[in-house]
């Protein structure tokens, strides 16, 4: 977010974080009585600040996360470039499980389109498959919906399932001075903040088909693990 005077912000790009948070709070308050009794299989586990939802499952907990690629898809749609969006979708979900200490196990996708396309679906499918292989999760299924009266462009989201031993969730409450923090270099902005990115591109007069004004080849562009 640009904070200098005259700069651009998320709200200026059409994303009101406070309004979104308020809407989410209203949704959650309406769901308060929809859960199973504590101590039974499937009952919710209270985890403040977590991006994944936890439920009881015997001596273990199951973790669920759902997310989409966001407005980055508008760039992919305009360029007909879908090779990486499956990777984005899987990563957004499994990362939300990992940050609470859960091991991702399986993933399902949801694709909404105004008109189905064999070529587009094939490219997305290959991207999802590669992403699931890298994340070591099972691509368990999904749903494709043709919704010409609702969507005008392809939309992609997914849900990931993971597990962890009961009571072993990471919430940050056990962090103490002197603990070792491990940081990984980012290979880019991934799937967050693209409403602002598109606004910057539009205001600058640049085109998505022009050469990148900064070097796209950075040492942190790709991280390999043994």
Describe the residue ranges of each PLM region.
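Helix-biased detector of long, well-ordered alpha-helical tracts
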Residues: 2-226
């Amino acid at each position: 977010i640009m904070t200098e005077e005259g700069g651009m912000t998320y709200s200026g790009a059409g994303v009101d974080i406070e309004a979104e948070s308020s809407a989410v709070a209203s949704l959650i308050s309406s769901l308060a009585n929809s859960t199973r009794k504590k101590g039974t299989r499937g009952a919710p586990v209270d985890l403040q600040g977590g991006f994944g939802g936890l439920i009881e499952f015997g001596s273990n907990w199951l973790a669920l996360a759902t997310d989409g690629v966001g407005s980055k898809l508008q760039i992919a749609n305009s360029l007909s470039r879908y090779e990486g969006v499956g990777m984005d979708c899987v990563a957004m979900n499994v990362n939300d499980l990992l940050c609470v200490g859960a091991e991702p196990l399986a993933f399902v996708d949801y694709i909404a389109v105004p008109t189905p396309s064999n070529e587009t679906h094939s490219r997305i499918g290959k991207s999802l498959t590669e992403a699931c292989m890298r994340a070591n999760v099972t691509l368990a299924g999904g749903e494709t919906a043709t919704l010409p009266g609702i969507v005008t462009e392809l939309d992609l989201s997914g849900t990931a399932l993971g597990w962890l031993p009961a009571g072993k969730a990471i919430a940050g409450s056990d962090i103490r001075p002197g603990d070792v923090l491990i940081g990984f270099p980012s290979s880019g902005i991934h799937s967050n903040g693209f409403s602002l990115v598109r606004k910057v591109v539009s205001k600058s007069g640049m085109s998505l088909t022009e050469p990148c004004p900064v070097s796209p080849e950075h040492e942190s562009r790709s991280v390999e693990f043994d």
